[in-house]
Amino acid sequence: MKKLFKMLAVILFVLIVFSACGRNESVSGKITSFPPYGERVVTAIGDSIAAGYGLDSQEDNYLTLFSDNIGAVLNNDAVSGYDSGEVLKSLSDEKTAADIKNADAIVVSVGGNDFFHRKDIMIDALKNALLHGEGFFPEEVTNIYDEYEKNLSRIIDEIKNMNPDAYIIVQTVYNPFLKQTLNFSYINVGKTANRYVTRLNDSIKNVCKTKNRVFVFDVAPEMNEDAENFYGTDEKLDIHPTKHGHATLARVFTEKFNGLLKD
């Protein structure tokens, strides 16, 4: 029984990670009319991933590195622990609103805490999933996904109302346990958790594909491939990126951003 609860806790912690879908997608296709190198402003909102939780120095935060790489000033308004509802409310904060209005690009990292804040529902759902099969999503869990989609859509719309010319970047959720050997009885933790991560990414994909000037940066493949990107081990449950992980995120962000700039 202890092993079962530990396994459920591991899967739940995966869902703290932040969030989006598969490819770089936007109705506009490319970034146009962007300020020159050295005159750019990036604003970040979201959760602990963007906030750089666990780092000794914010100079190692992937958003700091990314902004430096593209010649931009960074305003980081992300707050550890925020879920999508709290991020939505934060848009009315005076500093956050001002930073959004002055930004050329806004990075959004949010999603995992919507599930972590409802851990009782998720633990029950994970127990039921083990009994009923991998495709089983109880109504209570489906409601969390639905609420998240509504909040993310409102976040994007509010940003657009404040700054219609800005580009919005949403990043994917990664799974830090895919390269670890976390197994309980016949259950592979990484693969089991991936169902919930994939469903969350699908929710974000459904929202992002309807929005103009919104790009999705898929960081998951690069992050999932290297266990050194994460603090977590078989003995320590921690999904946050290490300094190495932040460097990986920064590289992926920089490559994808530069690839979207119109020639």
Model-derived features with residue positions:
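Structural recognition of the beta-strand scaffold that forms the well-ordered cores
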Residues: 41-46, 74-78, 104-109, 167-172, ...
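Serine-esterase "nucleophile elbow" of acetyl-processing enzymes
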Residues: 25-80, 96-98
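Oxyanion-hole/transition-state-stabilizing segment in secreted/luminal serine hydrolases
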Residues: 88-145
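Short amphipathic alpha-helices and their capping/turn segments at secondary-structure boundaries
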Residues: 29-37, 87-106, 154-165
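Catalytic His-Asp segment of secreted/periplasmic serine-dependent ester chemistry enzymes
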Residues: 173-263
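Solvent-exposed loop/turn segments at secondary-structure junctions
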Residues: 48-51, 79-85, 112-116, 174-178, ...
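Positively charged n-region of N-terminal signal peptides that target proteins for export
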Residues: 1-6
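C-terminal motif of bacterial Sec signal peptides marking the signal peptidase cleavage site
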Residues: 17-20
